[in-house]
């Protein structure tokens, strides 16, 4: 396996997880102090197979798998939920997550009915609140268990 880290200028793409790539994607992990923030990719992929609303992809920087994303989509109602989003610990801080989230937002906005993209975060040291706020996500004041719900309006006021 190639341990070369792609440059910050790498092209980020979202690709289907295949039988050939699933093991590599399942072996991507966040840092130890982030493990309480996101489920392992193997769990996410298994859950996706039991949810009609799930859409999931591996995140690549050039030809290197660097992360994973899963949305719960209800296109008819214009609702999107960022169910899982992770960048492997050794690839964090290089802009890949930012480029991937831009692609995810763009995907949701392609739907003329798209109203909002939701997500939830555990508010603790090392969580991604500020990362999401940088994209315009705002806290809704609602909770899902211990997770705080954030929302990005996709329709311009």
How would you label these PLM feature ranges?
Residues 2-5, 148-157:
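Terminal substrate-recognition subdomain of acyl/acetyltransferases
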Residues 7-83, 88-90, 101, 106-107, ...:
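Acetyl-CoA-dependent GNAT
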Residues 88-90, 94, 123-124:
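Active-site acidic-Proline motif in GNAT/NAT acetyltransferases
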Residues 95, 112-113, 136:
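Short glycine-rich hinge loops at helix-strand junctions in the catalytic core
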Residues 98, 123-141:
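Conserved active-site alpha-helix within GNAT-family acetyltransferase domains
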Residues 108-120:
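Conserved GNAT acetyl-CoA-binding A-motif
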Residues 118-129, 145-147, 155:
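Conserved beta-strand-loop-alpha-helix junction that forms the acyl-donor binding cleft
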